[in-house]
């Protein structure tokens, strides 16, 4: 990895997350999230969540939980926070946030809001059920 690249976790709706090495540029981050970026710092350690600034307004699909009552819409990136710069995740951070965001989540509508449930990215086949009809 060169000094102009950073190690991140890339999280897309309905897919397992990916560890990636990306150019440490605004353009690269905008391409991954599909638009202007917003940086959130939801945890006490030196980690940022970079998401699409208007993801919910633009109707991007719900992706993963953000806290206990909110969700991130569209693709997002988890990277290190170096103060004024984004930096690579450490091995420990990759381990922690890979566990947190590994599984895709489907959000089911309920009368009380959205209910998140872990899922797999593989399409479900019901052909085995038809054999018993």
State what each model feature region is:
Residues 1-2, 130:
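Solvent-exposed, charged interface segments at domain starts and junctions
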Residues 2-16, 20-121, 125:
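N-terminal nucleophile
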Residues 127-133:
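Conserved small/polar residues in nucleotide/adenosyl-binding loops
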């Amino acid at each position: 990895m060169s000094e102009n690249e950073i190690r991140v976790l890339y999280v897309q709706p309905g897919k397992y997350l990916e560890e990636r090495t990306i150019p440490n540029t605004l353009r690269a981050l905008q391409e991954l999230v599909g638009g202007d970026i917003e940086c959130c710092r939801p945890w006490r350690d030196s980690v940022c969540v970079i998401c699409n600034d208007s993801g919910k307004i633009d109707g991007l699909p719900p992706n993963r939980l953000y806290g206990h009552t909110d969700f991130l819409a569209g693709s997002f990136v988890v990277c290190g926070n170096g103060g004024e710069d984004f930096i690579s995740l450490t091995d420990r951070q990759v381990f922690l946030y890979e566990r947190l965001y590994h599984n895709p989540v489907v959000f089911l509508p309920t009368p009380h809001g959205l209910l998140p449930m872990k899922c797999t990215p593989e399409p479900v086949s019901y052909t085995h059920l038809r054999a018993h009809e």
